């Protein structure tokens, strides 16, 4: 049923929104509130809320209009996060984490055509991005990465990292992850890489019986990815 709901939401994702942002956010918040208790009790992904998020085209609201988004500001994004979070903590947190990753790509992509195409696709298909910044023994030290980006022939890269936590990783359409710049780089010499789901596989390592915001489905995974080197997010 969940897969069917997502498919139905994406079927209409290309249509431009006809309602203003507050109206759309209010509608999504109502759906999130209706399922908040079930989401937290069962520690399950808020599928109904994100069906509504996609239907109301909220995932690309801060992306520039030239790339298919609405070009809205961080204040607008914060308002939606606040409204969704009041209705369902997990829904609000997932939406906020997604928007942070979108903002990272926007801030640093420059003239990178590959990343621009990723944002176009995100808006057109209403794709959800996850974040992977914790790893192995590093725990909460997001300024240290064990796993290096490995450069291959033909402008390709590979990455294999043990992520101690990827929130909603099994439900996301892509992930933005930290990695060591290269095998001979120090652990603090990091890059960010953006992958679509077709670029990687996830193998579950561990669960997390969380207290609060249980619908974020934060679990540990081994992430194995192969993609274009152009998906490394440029430095400012």
Roles of regions detected by a PLM:
Residues 127, 143-145, 171-173, 189, ...:
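A generic structural signal for well-ordered coil/turn residues at beta-strand boundaries
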Residues 133-136, 161-163, 179-180, 195-198, ...:
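Fold-independent oxyanion-binding glycine-rich loops
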Residues 2-79:
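Alpha-helical interface subdomain recognition
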Residues 111-112, 202, 228-231:
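Short helix-loop capping/hinge motifs at secondary-structure junctions, enriched
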Residues 165-204:
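A short core secondary-structure module
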Residues 200-227:
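Flexible, small-/acidic-enriched active-site or ligand-binding loops
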Residues 47, 51-54, 60-167:
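Glycine-rich flavin
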Residues 224-236:
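A glycine-rich, basic-preceded beta-loop-alpha segment at the flavin cofactor/substrate interface
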